[in-house]
Amino acid sequence: MPTVLRWGPYRAFFYSNEGAEPAHIHVRSGHFEAKFWLHDLSVAVNAGFPAHEIGDIIRHLKLNREALLRAWKEHFGS
C-alpha cells in the first residue's frame, strides 16, 4: 500500500489491489480511515473521522489533487 502524501497525523495512500475501481485515495490517522473519490473529492467511506476533520482533509486533498491523480496513474497505469 504505497503512501502518496503525509501531513500532520495523516497518511494518504492506495491499496494496491484496488486499481479496477475509479481513482481514489485512502486517508488514515490513528484508528480512523476514510476513502475519497479523486474526481470530485467526495467521501466514499468514513470510518471514524468527525465531520469537521473530513472537511479539513478534503481541503488538503484539493490542494494536492493533481499530484494524487498523477500518482494513481503512475501506480495503476490508467
Sequence positions of predicted segments:
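Alpha-helical interaction segments
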Residues: V4, H26, K62-E66
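Glycine-rich, flexible loop/turn motifs
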Residues: M1, V45, W72
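Short, charged/polar N-terminal "headpieces" of proteins
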Residues: M1-E21
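A short, structured beta-strand/loop element
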Residues: Y15-P50
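C-terminal structural segments of small proteins and small subunits
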Residues: P50-S78
